[in-house]
Amino acid sequence: MLKCTIKNEQIETLRSGDTFVSYEIETESDLPVFEDKKFSVRRRYKDFEMLHNILSHDYNGYAIPPLPRKYTVSSFSGGSLSPIFIARRMQSLQTFLDRCSTHPVISNSMHMYQFLENNSWKSYYHNAWMQSENTKSKGNNVSGGIESSIQNLDPYAQSLYETAKQLLQNADTDLSKLEKTCVQYMNSVQNFPTDIPVPSNLSISNLDVVSVEFKRLKRNSIFLINSFHSKVITSIQDLEDYMVVFKSLIKSREQKVKQFEHFQQIVQSNSNNPDQSSRSDPNFVEATPVVQQTPELKPSPNTTIRTSSLFSIPKFFKKKRYSLGQDDANPMELLQLSFQELCIFNEKLEQELNFLRERIDVEMRKTLQMVCDCHVEYFSGILEQHAVKE
């Protein structure tokens, strides 16, 4: 169990006079990696950026949750220190942590643990980055055993690819409709009239009472709009930003397929014309039909994701004996490496799609609950004002 809660925002001032907002992150967990079951640290936005950077660097091929949008602070009275801006950022940072803490791979990352607990987070970040770079530069030869993987996996996995595109398309459509509906509703609330036509038979005293009630409703409507912005609209936009991350994964897969097909054409050409390239692999003639006959990779809802420790860099495609862009590399070797990269990418894409489905369900339910909560607060405020008046 790993539960993170952001609370107690605080405006702090540096010696230089610069101000920033820090947030308390309270963590509850029964994981043995933590000394305490409940603890807290204070973090600012730059610390979240560091976490996002190191996760993106070490967990390539995974859909790392995006950071909150950098809203145009000029649209908020008070800029980045305005209550509305801080509320929206807190909401998005909470969503970011929720996604990370429930992700089957990221939630087991030492980077995540250190972010939540280490008081010297900045120092840890720089050391971890340097160690990651050193491990990456050493490389690792993973070209062995590729023939056996070719017999078991289909690099194209067309059904997985189509499923991913359809899921993202449907999510985009639903989110756009929901956001449009919310904006229209907020506009109708914002245009709530303050003046009303006065019937000829209405006394001045009654008119004053009605006018006061309308002004009171207008004030409550402003609170409702602000609450909608900081909670509901922000939640929808955070989901839209998450979709962008998955779209980039789809584009990356398309590029890898093209790369695989490019090397496949080169090897086939060399096999058909062996005199044109002394470096062609003689075994490719036997390997090629196997690729075409392998069964298609089907998405499975019960995929188990393997985790990685901090210093075994969990990059899905480490440096190899041959670089895919190296001119003097063996074409067959490049084809095999490209094939392996694509197969591993397919596996991770399937895992990420399963997680995305769960997050869409959880976050949409949470958004609808926010809509209800906003209106409960709105009508409760009106009733409380009437109670005080009486």
Swiss-Prot record:
Domain of life from the UniProt record: Eukaryota
A single Gene Ontology CC term: membrane
Localization per Swiss-Prot or TrEMBL: Cytoplasm; Membrane
Gene Ontology MF: a single term: phosphatidylinositol-3-phosphate binding
Every PX domain range: 1-123
CDD domains, per database record: PX_Atg24p (cd06863)
Residues given in the record as a 1,2-diacyl-sn-glycero-3-phospho-(1D-myo-inositol-3-phosphate) binding sites: 44, 70, 89
Topology relative to the membrane: Peripheral membrane protein
Single biological process term from Gene Ontology: reticulophagy
This protein's UniProt keywords: Coiled coil, Cytoplasm, Lipid-binding, Membrane, Protein transport, Transport
Family of this protein: Belongs to the sorting nexin family.
Note on domains (UniProt): The PX domain binds phosphatidylinositol 3-phosphate which is necessary for peripheral membrane localization to the perivacuolar punctate structures.
Protein name in the entry: Sorting nexin C1711.11
